[in-house]
Amino acid sequence: MPMSTDASELPPPGAQDLWLALTASQLGAAHQATGLPNQDAVAVRQVRPDVLVAAVADGHGHRRHFRSARGSQLAVTVACEAAQELAARLDGFQTAAPIESEALGALVPAITGEWREAVREDVAAD
């Protein structure tokens, strides 16, 4: 399974907070048999020194959804950006209760709306 590391995403030497996230994705047998590409996407970002965000998306897995791999990538990008914005707003909170309330009330609809807009823009760019 090929693995890669983008050095631009690594913290500078001597950084106080160091997170390490390993991700992997395997092309399934059905995708191999039908020639479909891997439609999985994952993104991991350190949004604050004390907060690491991970987003995972799985494509539709059908030839009819030929943009599915791109849609998955857009989904994890949008999710990490939205989580980063949420983390910035919640910086002063000391308990999980406000985070849960904010996440359920605003984060999921924000991700969905931003993802749909990103997909529309991506389709229009083709």
Write out the residue ranges for each language-model feature.
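PP2C/PPM-type serine/threonine phosphatase catalytic domain
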Residues: 1-126
